Amino acid sequence: MGLSPRLPYLVVEGPIGAGKTTLARRLAADTGARLLLEKPEDNPFLPRFYRDPVGGALPAQLGFLLQRAGQVETFQQGDLFDRHWVADFLFDKDRLFAELTLSPADLALYDTLFQRLAWDVPAPDAVIYLTGPIETLLERIARRGRDYEASIDARYLEDLSARYARFFGRYQAAPVIEVDVSQVDLVAQPELYQELLLALARPRGYTRLRQAELL
């Protein structure tokens, strides 16, 4: 099943450990869409941030902002409406991390650059918002074993997840499909994955897809 012609640009989002990249890869492979991924390993300031959240926050955040802006430039090269795209990040969510980690002075500097870069970024046609309990996210982070994520704790994830929930609770730029990854296993239960594809064919407003609703 390919993506709907009405969805040339699909985004998978959610807090750290939710499974964004895994789902984005699968959707791209199964639908023939082109893939646009975050590359945290290419941000040279990220390990420093996890070691020193205060001193390393601004360089890491600006590194991600510029990286994402560079990736979005792909859309300005004429291919956005010629091909389907699946991305594992939403440009606008970059500010969630900035609000969480930056001092007021650094946030003001960040906002100046963010506004310059964000004004012509295209909105997605639909967003899959992955969410789940903090315990589930921490287990997934530990399982993938990235050294620079070893210091992520429950308090940080709770704050980040709350910011995601508020952000998507009022997000109106595109339809949002929320998937609770603790209730819906899109890998072990292929029938639920097919239901997600069907939901993408008729996206509308804000939809919550949980196991009881999908079966």
Specify the residue positions occupied by each region the protein language model found:
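Conserved lysine of the Walker
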Residues: 20
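Glycine-rich phosphate-binding loop used to anchor ATP phosphates in small-molecule kinases
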Residues: 56-122
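P-loop (Walker A) phosphate-binding loop of NTP-binding proteins
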Residues: 15
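Hydrophobic anchor at the beta1->P-loop junction of P-loop NTPases
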Residues: 12
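NTP-dependent small-molecule kinase module
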Residues: 142-151, 155-215
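Conserved substrate/cofactor phosphate-moiety recognition/catalytic segment
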Residues: 29-67
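Post-Walker A alpha-helix
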Residues: 23-24
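A glycine- and Lys/Arg-enriched "phosphate-lid" helix/loop adjacent to the NTP-binding pocket
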Residues: 94-165
